[in-house]
C-alpha cells in the first residue's frame, strides 16, 4: 500500500524541480496531524468536494439559467471539466496534479447564483460596502463560512498552497480585491495551470451550449478563426447530417487546439527561464507569463472570446434572462439589508456579533443556488407564497 510518505516520495521522484510538492507544503493556518494515506493536497481536494458550497454549484448558472435545459453546463459541471483539464495539463508538464485539481475544484465556490449577471449585480450592490469578487468570496468560504470542522477551526483549513492558488486565480471577469489576503509571491505554476484550464473549458463548452441552445449559429461562430478551424476539422471527419456529432467534434477540437498550444508554448517558456526550484517560480517578476498560449494563438483565442461575447453573452435570449435576474437580486438584497431578521438565524447571529449587515447579506445571497434564490424571492414578494 502507498502511504502518505510513499506518495510524497513518488512526487519527489517524478515531478519537475519547479513543481509544488505536498511534502514541502507551508502547511495550514491551524496545525493538524497528517493523514495516513493522503497527501495534504489530496486531503484539500476531498474537503472541497465534500463541502456544502461545492454541492450547491450543481444548481448555479454558467450561461443558461439552470431550469432552461438539462444538458446546459452548471457551475458544477464546469468545475469538473476545469479540474479534468488542469490534471491533463499538469501531468504533461510534470507539475502537481493534486494541487491543480484542488485549486480548480474550489475556484468557483464563491460565485453568486445566475452566472456573471449575478456577480455583476453583487459587485454593484457591494461597491460601497467592502466590495465583492467571486475569488475573494471563494476564499471566505474555505476560510470562514464552511462549518464542517467547528469548533476545531473555521472553514476548511486548506493548505497555504491551495489558498494561494485561489488568490492568484484571475480570469477576464475578475478584478481581485483580496483586502487582507495579499501576498508578494507570484502564482505557482499549478495556479497558472488551473487559471488556463478554466479559460480553455469555458471557451469550448460555451460554444457547445450556445449551439445546442440555437442561440449561437454556425454562421456566427465562423466569425472566429479558431471556431472556423475547429469546424473545418470536424466536418472532414463527421458524416453529413450528423449535427450533434459535428458539435461534439468541434468542441473536442477547440479543447485539443488550446491545450496543445498551451503545452508547447509553456514548455518553451520553462526551458527559457530554467527554473531550478519552486522558489524561483514564486519570485519570478518577468513581463512575459510562463504558462500561456503562444502570441499567434492568443490572438485566435481573443477572437473566439469576442465572438462569444457578441453572439452569445450579449444575445437577446441571454440578456433578457440576466436583466430580470439582476432586478430581483437587487430587490432581495435591499430587503434583507433593511430587514435582516428575514434571513436564517445563523446569519442574524453574525450581525448580532457585529459583522457588517451588508457583508452578511452578501454571504447569504452569494451562497444561494438559482433555485433557492427564486424561491426566496417568491416568499419575499409574491403574496400567494408564504
Region locations from a protein language model:
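Short N-terminal signal/transit or membrane-insertion segments
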Residues: 36-37, 103, 130
